[in-house]
């Protein structure tokens, strides 16, 4: 007999050599019917797994989050089976589960058409209805290679041949289809009910551009119809909000081939950029930061000393001049250490909070560039806090408080924290890491956050916190970071005089709230769908006249607004007022000041706010006061 422990704390005895499915069936037939996989001693396994010894067991169903990846992995096998049934001459290659779905790569002479994809999706539904049993098989490697060669699946044979000899090969069979896979999988194809094929793209075999191009079909799969519908709605909404599309429509910025990954900011986009910078500058000054400016182009000797040359050389832009190698800085930290080192620093000078809107360049692959979200030239709201070990907790708490205030001002209140602790390869002693990790954990908890652990994902020089925002349509964006560094002050010989009179190394906290301003603006464009709040909008008030004889008064209103720092636009053309209002609304200007005969006589304007038909009559002074009040909350 063996003892099996369950999540509710109960322990039950069973005959040895019982399968996980049989255990589920012994508990209840309904559980066995819903069961997808088993978690045995913390590891996901097929329900057919034989249990020989005492263990901890969870039976998982589609309601458990762990099963979502199983559903997606099953869907990848189902798409491959469907494609092979419809197009027997194609070859299958790889098909993993990915975030939000799955894909499968196929070798096919002619491209898949939209009709082909629709046929494949329909056949997938047929395979689900068949409820084909999915079984795991152990094969000898060489026999598996020969088998796949014999059925014309040469890509699959190549993958298996690259596995070391003697390693067991696991194949999964469903219907007439068989595929190489580690598993686990659900017991049958009937568990994958809610999916949709999304698009076809090219992909090189093994990700190598020297190899042949394959066709990749992407799909999404979910545990329930509601989840699938919500995801498809989110994608539809995301397409409407795409910052690249809105950037063109609202005349904010553009990109072009001659400067890949570099932003051409237009007047309105640059207004948003400068307003955000002004806002952050006010915040950091209030929180005791100094602001510095460091060179963009720096000799490689500094990057060698800091360690960046060895680790990031491929991502840096370098040039030769006067027998020297210079590099555009990819980050600001080594330069900030140089400022810290000017003059003798005492423990009384700490913490020293040094900020910079630093212009950085990173040689991102052209295929990875994506609008404002991934660029080669970027400015970070970067800062480094030089402090003593005993100040780490307080500085982290202060930073978390500042970060929360900033995110709230931009409308983000759902903030998640990820804590990345020590990696296997790291600098510093375990004692130092213990102190650092405990200080960060204590600070996060003091700041009122809970965190999820990313084991082993810290940098080699210290643990880090990542702050993740959830936007209006449920997407998550990692923006803020706080990273502890024991190594750079050592490498660049930064020190301060402690109270005891001895020299000590400061701890360096790398921190950013927005990350890159470019990316954050991209996120904001999509968060607001282009409808910026008044304080941030590039044009705060648009003025529109009903008839041309009101133009002089309209210009008088515009001058008063401009003189008081209000960003304005005006249309005093002969066009109809409804056309003017529609055009300004399409530009997503938050307030439109309509001027008619009565407004001129009373020295008023009639305000229409974006997205409403409500009207409000204000004097020029009242309008200015209203805008100033909004601005002063943030600027």
Curated annotation (Swiss-Prot):
Keyword Nucleus: no
UniProt enzyme class: ligase
Cofactor list: Zn(2+)
Locations listed in the record: Cytoplasm
A GO molecular-function annotation: threonine-tRNA ligase activity
Domain of life: Bacteria
Any Pfam family the entry gives: tRNA_SAD
Region (Catalytic): 242-533
UniProt keyword terms in alphabetical order: Aminoacyl-tRNA synthetase, ATP-binding, Cytoplasm, Ligase, Metal-binding, Nucleotide-binding, Protein biosynthesis, RNA-binding, tRNA-binding, Zinc
Function: Catalyzes the attachment of threonine to tRNA(Thr) in a two-step reaction: L-threonine is first activated by ATP to form Thr-AMP and then transferred to the acceptor end of tRNA(Thr). Also edits incorrectly charged L-seryl-tRNA(Thr).
UniProt similarity note: Belongs to the class-II aminoacyl-tRNA synthetase family.
Name used for this protein in its record: Threonine--tRNA ligase
Species this protein is from: Rickettsia felis (strain ATCC VR-1525 / URRWXCal2) (Rickettsia azadi)
Gene from which the chain derives: thrS
């Amino acid at each position: 007999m063996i003892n099996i422990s369950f999540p509710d704390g109960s322990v039950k005895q069973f005959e040895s050599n019982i399968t996980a499915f049989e255990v589920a069936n012994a508990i209840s037939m309904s559980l066995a019917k819903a069961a997808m996989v088993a978690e045995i001693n913390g590891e996901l396994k097929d329900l057919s797994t034989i249990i020989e010894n005492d263990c901890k067991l969870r039976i998982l169903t589609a309601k458990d989050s762990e099963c979502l990846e199983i559903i997606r992995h099953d869907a990848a096998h189902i798409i491959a089976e469907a494609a092979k049934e419809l197009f027997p001459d194609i070859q299958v290659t790889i098909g993993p589960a990915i975030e939000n779905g799955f894909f499968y790569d196929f070798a096919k002479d002619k491209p898949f058409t939209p009709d082909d994809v629709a046929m494949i999706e329909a056949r997938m539904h047929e395979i689900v209805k068949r409820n084909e049993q999915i079984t795991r098989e152990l094969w000898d490697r060489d026999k598996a290679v020969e088998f796949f060669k014999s059925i014309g699946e040469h890509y699959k044979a190549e993958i298996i041949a690259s596995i070391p000899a003697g390693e067991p090969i696991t194949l999964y069979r469903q219907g007439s289809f068989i595929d190489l896979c580690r598993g686990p999988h659900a017991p049958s194809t009937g568990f994958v009910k809610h999916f949709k094929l999304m698009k076809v793209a090219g992909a090189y075999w093994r990700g190598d551009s020297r190899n042949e191009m394959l066709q990749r079909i992407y799909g999404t799969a979910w545990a329930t119809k509601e989840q699938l519908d919500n995801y498809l709605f989110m994608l539809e909404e995301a397409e409407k909000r795409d910052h690249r599309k809105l950037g063109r429509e609202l005349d904010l910025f553009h990109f072009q081939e001659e400067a890949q990954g570099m932003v051409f900011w237009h007047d309105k986009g640059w207004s948003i950029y400068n307003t955000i910078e002004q806002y952050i500058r006010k915040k950091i000054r209030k929180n005791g930061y100094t602001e510095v400016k460091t060179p963009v182009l720096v000799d490689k000797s500094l990057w060698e000393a800091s360690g960046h040359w060895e680790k990031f050389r491929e991502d840096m832009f370098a040039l030769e001049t006067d027998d020297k190698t210079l590099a555009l800085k990819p980050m600001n930290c080594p330069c900030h250490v140089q400022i810290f080192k000017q003059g003798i620093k005492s423990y009384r000078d700490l913490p020293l909070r040094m900020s910079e809107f630093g212009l950085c360049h990173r040689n991102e692959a052209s295929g990875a560039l994506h609008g404002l979200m991934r660029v080669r030239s970027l400015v970070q709201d970067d800062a480094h806090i030089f402090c003593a070990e005993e100040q780490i907790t307080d500085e982290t708490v202060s930073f978390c408080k500042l970060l929360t205030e900033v995110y709230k001002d931009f409308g983000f209140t759902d903030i998640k924290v990820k804590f990345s602790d020590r990696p296997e390869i790291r600098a510093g002693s375990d004692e130092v890491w213990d102190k650092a990790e405990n200080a960060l954990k204590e600070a996060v908890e003091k700041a009122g956050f809970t965190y999820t652990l990313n084991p082993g994902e810290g940098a080699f020089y210290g643990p880090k916190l990542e702050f993740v925002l959830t936007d209006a349509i449920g997407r998550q964006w990692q923006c803020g970071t706080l990273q502890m560094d024991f190594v750079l002050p050592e490498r660049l010989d930064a020190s301060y005089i402690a109270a005891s009179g001895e020299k000590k190394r400061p701890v360096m906290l790398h921190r950013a709230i927005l990350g890159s301003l470019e990316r954050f603006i991209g996120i904001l464009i999509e968060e607001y769908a282009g409808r910026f709040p008044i304080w941030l909008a590039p044009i705060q008030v648009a003025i529109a006249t009903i008839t041309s004889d009101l133009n002089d008064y309209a210009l008088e209103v515009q001058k008063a607004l401009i003189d008081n720092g209000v960003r304005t636009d005006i249309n005093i053309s002969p066009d109809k007022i409804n056309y003017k209002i529609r055009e300004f609304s399409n530009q997503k200007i938050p307030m439109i000041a309509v001027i008619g005969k009565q407004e001129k006589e009373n020295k008023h304007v009639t305000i229409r706010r974006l997205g409403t038909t409500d009207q409000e009559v204000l004097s020029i002074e009242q309008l200015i006061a209203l805008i100033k009040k909004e601005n002063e909350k943030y600027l």
